Amino acid sequence: ERTFNLYPNMVSLIYGNREYLWRETYDRCIRLASGLQKIGLKKGEVVTVIAANTPEMFECQFAVAMAGGVLNTVNIRLDADTIAYIFEHAEPRILISDTGFSDVISKALKQSKYTDFKIIDIIDEQDRSSASATPIGQYTYEQLIELGDGKFNWQLPDDEWDAICLNYTSGTGGLPKGVVYHHRGAYLMAMGTIPAWQMQMHPTYLYTVPMFHCNGWGHAWMMGLLAGKVICTR
Protein backbone atom coordinates (compact mmCIF):
# COMPACT_ATOMS: atom_id res chain seq x y z
CA GLU A 1 0.00 0.00 0.00
CA ARG A 2 2.86 2.40 0.81
CA THR A 3 4.44 1.78 -2.59
CA PHE A 4 1.08 2.32 -4.31
CA ASN A 5 0.66 5.64 -2.47
CA LEU A 6 4.19 6.94 -3.09
CA TYR A 7 5.14 5.42 -6.45
CA PRO A 8 1.89 4.58 -8.28
CA ASN A 9 3.27 5.18 -11.77
CA MET A 10 6.50 3.23 -11.45
CA VAL A 11 6.71 -0.11 -13.24
CA SER A 12 6.05 -3.03 -10.89
CA LEU A 13 6.28 -6.04 -13.17
CA ILE A 14 7.18 -7.11 -16.69
CA TYR A 15 6.29 -10.47 -18.21
CA GLY A 16 6.76 -10.87 -21.96
CA ASN A 17 4.58 -8.21 -23.57
CA ARG A 18 2.70 -7.50 -20.32
CA GLU A 19 3.74 -4.56 -18.16
CA TYR A 20 2.13 -3.27 -14.97
CA LEU A 21 2.55 -0.15 -12.85
CA TRP A 22 2.40 -0.36 -9.08
CA ARG A 23 -1.05 1.24 -9.04
CA GLU A 24 -2.25 -1.50 -11.41
CA THR A 25 -0.67 -4.27 -9.36
CA TYR A 26 -2.19 -2.89 -6.17
CA ASP A 27 -5.62 -2.63 -7.80
CA ARG A 28 -5.43 -6.20 -9.10
CA CYS A 29 -4.36 -7.48 -5.67
CA ILE A 30 -7.24 -5.62 -4.00
CA ARG A 31 -9.73 -7.07 -6.48
CA LEU A 32 -8.27 -10.56 -6.20
CA ALA A 33 -8.49 -10.43 -2.40
CA SER A 34 -12.10 -9.28 -2.63
CA GLY A 35 -12.90 -11.94 -5.23
CA LEU A 36 -11.46 -14.68 -3.03
CA GLN A 37 -13.71 -13.63 -0.16
CA LYS A 38 -16.72 -13.40 -2.46
CA ILE A 39 -16.35 -17.03 -3.54
CA GLY A 40 -16.10 -18.23 0.03
CA LEU A 41 -12.62 -17.72 1.50
CA LYS A 42 -12.66 -17.08 5.23
CA LYS A 43 -9.93 -15.89 7.57
CA GLY A 44 -7.24 -18.49 8.15
CA GLU A 45 -8.28 -20.76 5.28
CA VAL A 46 -5.76 -22.02 2.75
CA VAL A 47 -5.44 -20.96 -0.88
CA THR A 48 -3.29 -23.38 -2.86
CA VAL A 49 -1.52 -22.00 -5.94
CA ILE A 50 0.11 -24.16 -8.61
CA ALA A 51 1.74 -21.82 -11.11
CA ALA A 52 5.04 -20.77 -12.62
CA ASN A 53 6.68 -17.36 -12.15
CA THR A 54 3.93 -15.33 -13.77
CA PRO A 55 2.21 -12.06 -12.78
CA GLU A 56 -0.62 -14.05 -11.24
CA MET A 57 1.74 -15.91 -8.93
CA PHE A 58 3.33 -12.59 -7.93
CA GLU A 59 -0.08 -11.07 -7.16
CA CYS A 60 -1.06 -14.06 -5.04
CA GLN A 61 1.90 -13.38 -2.72
CA PHE A 62 0.05 -10.24 -1.60
CA ALA A 63 -3.64 -10.82 -2.33
CA VAL A 64 -4.16 -14.03 -0.38
CA ALA A 65 -2.86 -12.38 2.80
CA MET A 66 -4.97 -9.28 2.09
CA ALA A 67 -8.01 -11.57 2.01
CA GLY A 68 -7.04 -13.07 5.36
CA GLY A 69 -6.02 -16.39 3.80
CA VAL A 70 -2.95 -18.59 4.07
CA LEU A 71 -0.97 -18.99 0.84
CA ASN A 72 0.15 -22.51 -0.11
CA THR A 73 2.35 -22.53 -3.22
CA VAL A 74 3.04 -25.99 -4.65
CA ASN A 75 6.09 -27.14 -6.59
CA ILE A 76 5.04 -27.43 -10.25
CA ARG A 77 7.40 -30.38 -10.74
CA LEU A 78 5.69 -32.69 -8.24
CA ASP A 79 3.84 -35.78 -9.43
CA ALA A 80 0.11 -36.36 -9.01
CA ASP A 81 0.51 -38.60 -5.94
CA THR A 82 2.41 -35.92 -4.04
CA ILE A 83 0.05 -33.12 -5.06
CA ALA A 84 -2.90 -35.27 -3.96
CA TYR A 85 -1.28 -35.74 -0.56
CA ILE A 86 -0.78 -31.97 -0.19
CA PHE A 87 -4.46 -31.39 -1.04
CA GLU A 88 -5.43 -33.84 1.70
CA HIS A 89 -3.05 -32.38 4.28
CA ALA A 90 -3.50 -28.64 3.56
CA GLU A 91 -7.27 -28.82 2.95
CA PRO A 92 -7.42 -25.67 0.82
CA ARG A 93 -10.63 -23.74 0.34
CA ILE A 94 -9.54 -22.53 -3.11
CA LEU A 95 -7.08 -23.81 -5.72
CA ILE A 96 -5.58 -21.35 -8.21
CA SER A 97 -3.80 -23.27 -10.95
CA ASP A 98 -2.15 -22.58 -14.29
CA THR A 99 -3.88 -24.58 -17.03
CA GLY A 100 -0.44 -25.59 -18.29
CA PHE A 101 -0.41 -28.03 -15.37
CA SER A 102 -4.03 -29.20 -15.73
CA ASP A 103 -3.09 -32.77 -16.68
CA VAL A 104 -1.16 -33.55 -13.50
CA ILE A 105 -3.66 -31.60 -11.37
CA SER A 106 -6.57 -33.56 -12.87
CA LYS A 107 -4.81 -36.80 -11.96
CA ALA A 108 -4.20 -35.51 -8.44
CA LEU A 109 -7.87 -34.58 -8.07
CA LYS A 110 -8.88 -38.14 -8.95
CA GLN A 111 -6.49 -39.57 -6.36
CA SER A 112 -7.07 -37.12 -3.52
CA LYS A 113 -9.55 -37.89 -0.75
CA TYR A 114 -10.05 -34.14 -0.32
CA THR A 115 -11.36 -32.05 -3.21
CA ASP A 116 -13.75 -29.71 -1.41
CA PHE A 117 -12.40 -26.54 -2.99
CA LYS A 118 -13.17 -24.18 -5.84
CA ILE A 119 -10.72 -24.09 -8.75
CA ILE A 120 -9.54 -20.93 -10.49
CA ASP A 121 -7.81 -21.27 -13.87
CA ILE A 122 -4.82 -19.11 -14.80
CA ILE A 123 -4.71 -19.02 -18.60
CA ASP A 124 -1.32 -17.78 -19.74
CA GLU A 125 -1.76 -16.62 -23.34
CA GLN A 126 2.01 -16.27 -23.71
CA ASP A 127 2.60 -19.95 -23.01
CA ARG A 128 1.44 -22.50 -25.57
CA SER A 129 0.85 -25.30 -23.07
CA SER A 130 -1.30 -23.07 -20.86
CA ALA A 131 -3.22 -21.30 -23.62
CA SER A 132 -4.14 -24.56 -25.41
CA ALA A 133 -5.03 -26.60 -22.31
CA THR A 134 -8.56 -27.46 -21.23
CA PRO A 135 -9.70 -25.37 -18.24
CA ILE A 136 -10.72 -27.36 -15.15
CA GLY A 137 -12.01 -24.57 -12.91
CA GLN A 138 -15.27 -22.80 -12.13
CA TYR A 139 -13.72 -19.38 -12.84
CA THR A 140 -10.78 -17.97 -14.70
CA TYR A 141 -8.32 -15.81 -12.81
CA GLU A 142 -9.36 -12.71 -14.75
CA GLN A 143 -13.02 -13.40 -14.01
CA LEU A 144 -12.15 -13.44 -10.31
CA ILE A 145 -10.36 -10.10 -10.70
CA GLU A 146 -13.47 -8.67 -12.40
CA LEU A 147 -15.67 -10.07 -9.63
CA GLY A 148 -13.60 -8.30 -6.98
CA ASP A 149 -14.32 -4.87 -5.53
CA GLY A 150 -11.69 -2.22 -6.26
CA LYS A 151 -12.66 -0.46 -3.00
CA PHE A 152 -12.29 -3.59 -0.89
CA ASN A 153 -11.18 -2.73 2.64
CA TRP A 154 -8.49 -5.30 3.27
CA GLN A 155 -7.38 -5.87 6.83
CA LEU A 156 -4.01 -6.31 8.50
CA PRO A 157 -3.59 -9.55 10.51
CA ASP A 158 -4.96 -9.52 14.04
CA ASP A 159 -1.58 -10.68 15.32
CA GLU A 160 1.90 -10.63 13.80
CA TRP A 161 2.17 -14.35 14.56
CA ASP A 162 -0.84 -15.19 12.38
CA ALA A 163 -0.07 -17.54 9.49
CA ILE A 164 0.72 -15.97 6.12
CA CYS A 165 1.69 -19.09 4.19
CA LEU A 166 2.01 -22.86 4.32
CA ASN A 167 4.93 -24.38 2.45
CA TYR A 168 5.79 -28.02 1.88
CA THR A 169 9.00 -29.89 1.29
CA SER A 170 9.19 -31.84 -1.97
CA GLY A 171 8.89 -35.24 -0.31
CA THR A 172 12.29 -36.53 -1.41
CA GLY A 173 12.80 -38.13 2.01
CA GLY A 174 9.25 -39.38 2.52
CA LEU A 175 5.95 -37.55 2.50
CA PRO A 176 6.08 -33.73 2.18
CA LYS A 177 6.32 -31.83 5.45
CA GLY A 178 4.32 -28.65 5.88
CA VAL A 179 5.82 -25.55 7.48
CA VAL A 180 3.73 -22.54 8.53
CA TYR A 181 5.22 -19.05 8.09
CA HIS A 182 3.86 -16.12 10.10
CA HIS A 183 3.49 -12.47 9.09
CA ARG A 184 6.31 -11.41 11.39
CA GLY A 185 8.71 -13.89 9.81
CA ALA A 186 7.76 -12.87 6.27
CA TYR A 187 8.29 -9.20 7.14
CA LEU A 188 11.68 -9.85 8.73
CA MET A 189 12.75 -12.02 5.80
CA ALA A 190 11.92 -9.26 3.33
CA MET A 191 13.44 -6.49 5.44
CA GLY A 192 16.56 -8.46 6.27
CA THR A 193 17.41 -9.11 2.64
CA ILE A 194 17.67 -5.38 1.88
CA PRO A 195 20.80 -4.63 3.98
CA ALA A 196 22.24 -8.09 3.35
CA TRP A 197 22.19 -7.46 -0.41
CA GLN A 198 22.92 -3.73 -0.02
CA MET A 199 19.76 -2.98 -1.97
CA GLN A 200 18.79 0.54 -3.02
CA MET A 201 15.33 1.87 -3.82
CA HIS A 202 13.74 0.95 -7.17
CA PRO A 203 15.87 -2.05 -8.11
CA THR A 204 15.17 -4.32 -11.07
CA TYR A 205 15.01 -8.01 -10.19
CA LEU A 206 14.95 -10.90 -12.66
CA TYR A 207 12.85 -13.46 -10.78
CA THR A 208 14.70 -16.70 -11.52
CA VAL A 209 14.04 -18.28 -8.11
CA PRO A 210 10.73 -20.21 -8.29
CA MET A 211 8.05 -18.44 -6.28
CA PHE A 212 6.84 -21.83 -5.07
CA HIS A 213 10.15 -22.30 -3.22
CA CYS A 214 9.72 -20.58 0.16
CA ASN A 215 7.64 -17.89 -1.56
CA GLY A 216 10.59 -17.08 -3.78
CA TRP A 217 12.64 -16.41 -0.62
CA GLY A 218 10.36 -13.47 0.15
CA HIS A 219 11.69 -11.40 -2.73
CA ALA A 220 8.20 -10.43 -3.94
CA TRP A 221 7.57 -8.76 -0.60
CA MET A 222 11.03 -7.18 -0.67
CA MET A 223 10.36 -5.67 -4.10
CA GLY A 224 7.09 -4.29 -2.79
CA LEU A 225 9.00 -2.57 0.02
CA LEU A 226 11.53 -1.06 -2.41
CA ALA A 227 9.06 -0.13 -5.18
CA GLY A 228 11.17 -2.22 -7.52
CA LYS A 229 10.60 -3.69 -10.95
CA VAL A 230 10.13 -7.46 -11.17
CA ILE A 231 10.83 -9.31 -14.40
CA CYS A 232 9.01 -12.64 -14.45
CA THR A 233 10.25 -15.64 -16.43
CA ARG A 234 8.06 -18.70 -16.74
Stretches found by the model and what they are:
Residues 45-46, 52-80, 88-94, 203-204, ...:
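A short helix-loop-beta submotif of the ANL/AMP-binding
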Residues 2-5, 39, 52-55, 209-213:
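AMP-binding (ANL) adenylation modules
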Residues 121, 133-168, 175, 198-204:
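Conserved pre-ATP/AMP-binding loop-to-beta segment of ANL
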Residues 187-204, 212-234:
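Conserved AMP-binding/adenylation subdomain of ANL enzymes
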Residues 47, 64, 95, 163, ...:
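Conserved S/T- and glycine-rich ATP-binding loop of Class I adenylate-forming
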